[in-house]
Structure formats: structure tokens, C-alpha cells
Amino acid sequence: MFPMVTGFMNYGQQTVRAARYIGQSFMITLSHANRLPVTIQYPYEKLITSERFRGRIHFEFDKCIACEVCVRVCPIDLPVVDWKLETDIRKKRLLNYSIDFGICIFCGNCVEYCPTNCLSMTEEYELSTYDRHELNYNQIALGRLPMSVIGDYTIRTILNSTPIKKTAGNPLDSKTITNF
């Protein structure tokens, strides 16, 4: 054939292929147009954390036996445990317990290996501050109960604001809340 005709046929095929690709990408764009937004307005709306979320550590002073297992299993030897040996009853008495959340990696080993379950992970994740020394929590600050995101009336949680279809096979968890 003539080189001009074959060049024109290749040009026509390339034009049709390009139009098909543009049409496919436009259809994908249109299919995403009717979705709900994934982003939230953070200070006023908060996502509900999952059940196994590892937030701030909660400490119960009365349950602690000062065994220092939490210090031994911590990869960075973070919890500071001060205790005194009571010779008359031959037991340790806990004097001070503190964790610096500026250094903590929230691995959860201390919670997992605690024999008396005096440590637990909370859903509290807003630990930001202007002074890093305020992140060093003692037993009083660690014993404070966390503020519940669901119970705060000033914050609209995503659970209440979006329509959620609960299926019979899937239990309701944070993945069904955030995946629209």
C-alpha cells in the first residue's frame, strides 16, 4: 500500500484508541462524583476509634504490685517505677509511676504483659502540647479517665452524621463507618 494511506490508518487507529481511553477515564471520574466525602472537619467532627485502638495509657494505682514487668517488656525502657520494700510485710509499695508520652511508641507491650491488668489503652489520642515536658504523665495524670468522643455533645461524631447500612453478615465496626 501507499505509505500515506498506512500512515493515515495508523493515525486513525491512534485517534480512536485515545478517544476510548479518554472516555474510560471520564466514566471513572463520573462514577466517583456521587460518593460522599472521605475527609472530615477535624476539630468539630471526629472519627470513632476502633475497639483495639492504642491511645493514651490508663493506669490504676491500686492494682499495681510494682513488679516492673512493664519496664522489662518496653522496647525503650520507658515507664519509671519507684517503689519501696516494706520489710514488715515483705511486699513492694509503689511510690511513683510515670510515662513520658513524648518518647512512648504506643506498642502496647506494657498493657499486654501486665499481670494485674492495671494498665489499659484508651481511645484518647489528642496529646499535643506546646511544651514537651507536659507529656510526662505521673500516676495521677495516668489515672484520669479519658474523655469519651461519643459522649461529648460539642463534637459531632461521624457515627451519628452518616447513614450507615448494617448488613446481617458484617458487625458494625469502625471500618464500616469510614468506608463509604
Curated annotation (Swiss-Prot):
Q: Which cofactor does it need?
A: [4Fe-4S] cluster
User: For the 4Fe-4S ferredoxin-type domain, which residue ranges apply?
Assistant: 55-84, 95-124
Membrane topology, as annotated: Peripheral membrane protein
For binding [4Fe-4S] cluster 2, which residues are annotated in this chain's numbering? Answer: 74, 104, 107, 110
One Gene Ontology term of the molecular function aspect = 4 iron, 4 sulfur cluster binding
Main location as per UniProt: plastid
Keywords from the UniProt entry: 4Fe-4S, Chloroplast, Iron, Iron-sulfur, Membrane, Metal-binding, NAD, NADP, Plastid, Plastoquinone, Quinone, Repeat, Thylakoid, Translocase
Q: What is catalysed by this protein?
A: a plastoquinone + NADH + (n+1) H(+)(in) = a plastoquinol + NAD(+) + n H(+)(out); a plastoquinone + NADPH + (n+1) H(+)(in) = a plastoquinol + NADP(+) + n H(+)(out)
Intracellular or extracellular location(s): Plastid, Chloroplast thylakoid membrane
Question: What binding details are noted for the cofactor?
Answer: Binds 2 [4Fe-4S] clusters per subunit.
Positions annotated to bind [4Fe-4S] cluster 1: 64, 67, 70, 114
Q: Which GO terms describe its cellular component?
A: chloroplast thylakoid membrane
Give the InterPro entries listed for this entry.
4Fe4S_Fe-S-bd, 4Fe4S_Fe_S_CS, NADH_quinone_OxRdtase_chainI, NDHI
Which superkingdom is the protein from?
A: Eukaryota
Any Pfam family hit: Fer4
Report the enzyme's class at the first EC level.
translocase
Describe the family membership recorded for this protein in Swiss-Prot or TrEMBL: Belongs to the complex I 23 kDa subunit family.
Job description of the protein: NDH shuttles electrons from NAD(P)H:plastoquinone, via FMN and iron-sulfur (Fe-S) centers, to quinones in the photosynthetic chain and possibly in a chloroplast respiratory chain. The immediate electron acceptor for the enzyme in this species is believed to be plastoquinone. Couples the redox reaction to proton translocation, and thus conserves the redox energy in a proton gradient.
Q: What is this protein called?
A: NAD(P)H-quinone oxidoreductase subunit I, chloroplastic
